[in-house]
A protein has these predicted regions:
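Bacterial N-terminal signal peptides that target proteins for export
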Residues: 1-9
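N-terminal signal peptide c-region/cleavage motif recognized by signal peptidases
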Residues: 17-19
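N-terminal accessory beta-strand-rich subdomains and adjacent acidic, glycine-rich linkers
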Residues: 23-149
Length: 149
């Protein structure tokens, strides 16, 4: 195999691996969609919120999205605006950097509960971000649960 072929193969595999790691989450009500980017090991970000998106729109969300804001901004790391959370760790450090660990979705009566599990990259500090989308009204409920071990 030539060096050029190896380079193309490596680039293709890198592209596939990058796309496999990205996880878009669409939280929808009858007339609205909230789209989040939750890459495993990466930062939770808003991609879009507005009118309900079609499957075609969702497939092209990265190309059209100009909204790339942190969904749960924390104090201490890349937070130019107001932080949703500020923590002073046991060693006195106030830097917190949350990464996506996993995502779970559960169907409930007339609603879908999506939970994004976040963990600090250094400390045993956890945040669960919950979104509950109702299927009979245009309402998305959001709350967090914070834990430390």
């Amino acid at each position: 195999m030539s060096a050029k072929s190896k380079l193309y193969l490596l680039a293709g595999l890198s592209f596939l691996a990058g796309n496999a790691m990205a996880q878009h989450i669409c939280i929808s009500t009858p007339n609205t969609s909230l789209v989040l980017n939750a890459p495993n090991g990466g930062e939770l970000k808003y991609l879009s919120y507005g009118s309900k998106l079609s499957e075609t729109d969702l497939q092209h969300i990265n190309e059209a999205s100009n909204c790339n804001h942190t969904a749960y901004p924390v104090y201490g790391m890349n937070c130019p605006g107001e932080a949703a959370l500020s923590v002073k760790h046991a060693d006195g450090n106030m830097s917190t950097q949350m990464e996506v660990v996993s995502v779970s979705t559960n169907q409930e009566n007339q609603s879908t509960l999506t939970t994004i599990h976040l963990k600090d990259k250094v400390y045993p500090f956890y945040v669960d971000v919950h979104y509950k989308a109702y299927q009979d009204v245009d309402m998305i409920e959001a709350w967090t649960e914070i834990g430390h071990t």
